[in-house]
């Protein structure tokens, strides 16, 4: 892939990670839809809905990505996989939606985390210049202005945009304390 740039990809992955944390806190998971695989989006949607149902808000703020690096690239059949490590520091705590009382965590304490992010795309897809500035304003299949639906489909042509068919999507995210 001659246009692939590790530097641009890591900048893209940082942006996705920060958007993910903001969408989680704001409970606006549809904002992360273009960047996650169908399976991961469903998993995260269910987890977020549990917080909403129990009237709790998981606040993740003051996110600072300290370091990123690529771990591995593999191609298996019709899928390419990129794994990377992201080290970040943030505030992470849970409050009661109504009273704003802190239920878990400490809003005054930094949490140092190490994440493994797994991105996938269809084998053979080539990086297009500027994809580090991924936009959801146009469908990569038909070019129509679009808002991606919760099913990940273009509302005009019906193409599933979030499968990695056209570009990298986050398919897994694992984190643990550390730095």
Q: Where in this protein do the model-derived segments appear?
A:
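Residue-level marker of positions within ordered structural domains that often coincide
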Residues: 37, 89, 124
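Short, charged low-complexity intrinsically disordered segments located at boundaries
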Residues: 23-25, 45-52, 71-80, 145-150
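Core segments of small alpha/beta cavity-forming domains
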Residues: 1-62, 141, 155-160, 176
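Acidic-enriched, low-complexity/disordered segments with a strong bias for Aspartate over Glutamate
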Residues: 1, 26, 53, 61, ...
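Sparse, context-dependent recognition of short Cys/His-centered cofactor- or disulfide-binding micro-motifs
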Residues: 17, 53-58, 67-71, 102-104, ...
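Surface-exposed, charged secondary-structure patches
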Residues: 53-98
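Short beta-strand edge/turn micro-motifs at domain boundaries
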Residues: 81, 99-179
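Generic alpha-helix detector with strongest preference for long hydrophobic helices that associate
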Residues: 1, 13-14, 65, 94, ...
